[in-house]
Amino acid sequence: MQREPLVSLPATLLAPAVGELGGDNRPPARFLMGVDGGATKTLAAVLDLQERRLHLGHGGSSNPDSVGAHAATDSLVKATDEAIDRAGIEREQLDGAVLAIAGTDTDAVATNVRERCPSAWTVVNDVVGAWAAATAARPGVGVISGTGSNVLGVGHGGHVWRAGGWGHVLGDEGSGYWLALQSIRAALADREASGPETALVTAAIDFFEVPSVEALATLVYTKPLSKGEIAAFAIETARVAHAGDEVARSLYLRAADELARQIAAVIEQTTLTGEFPVGLIGSAFKAGELFVAPLASAIAELAPRARVAVVEMAPVGGCVLLAALAAGRPYSVDPGELKPLLDAALVHEAVLRD
């Protein structure tokens, strides 16, 4: 059955995927901005092509599904204004801007963002930035597993397909939130003797600072805990799994299966074949081979020549690459040069905040 894609991209952003870059004959660009907005935080980066410097801006969650449209847009404006101010420019001086924001799949949400941002700025879903960081905006697949999860692929003919990204109530399988929630459920199952014993019980008690694991139910429902607060427990899931707990380890196998199912749909619908990158992005992959190895194995069965790797460049870097495409200056940014600039800016920010 023929299905309509859940997401579409402007033709300018698909130029590398379809081999239509053409010549870059416009005057050189000076300032480009990329924004990566997720359920936990928002990061904006303005690249000064003349000075070869990146200026960063920060905000809270910009996912309207998590915090509401108004608060999400406030975070977005805060981050972009901060980055633009640090670059010492006005909004109008940006040659291109791409905002990859979680939850912006619907026209209504995108319209709300555009009401407070210049119309020339391109607004796409956050997984688009991850795909660009993973593939340099060329055919391939980007996989997010952070607080939430999402998969996007672009085929050699520019066909786009997304799977996942339905939020923590309806989806987010294989994400940090999902891993944390399954860990809490496993701890409760241990407590009531309906599941195997697991060190996740002690880990949950210590992490959430509750007197007993059953007290978690009260904490979750009466406080209530936010999506991000629950997702933060995934770091303990990884620690317990690395220590050899079989229940925690099994959760990573299940998470890999969930993501592989979505990746399979994306590969099939985009008709990707041969050699192409599958880039893994997000905090959940910090668990390392515990998570990456079973996922890579599952992907190898789907596409034996796919190159699976954890992406080293942050998604906001992918958004800057897309901003160059949106500005019609596809050759103005070298991905190999952008990553060290971004790494240096992030290290500088971390030092300032400590």
How does the language model describe each region?
Residues 98-104, 145-147, 276-287:
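Glycine-rich beta-strand-to-loop/alpha-helix junction loops that act as flexible
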Residues 2-93, 133-139, 184-354:
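ATP-binding/phosphotransfer module of carbohydrate and carboxylate kinases, centering on a glycine-rich
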Residues 41, 96, 148:
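Broad gene-expression machinery/nucleic-acid interaction feature
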Residues 96, 120-122, 277:
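Proline-centered loop/turn at the N-terminus of a beta-strand
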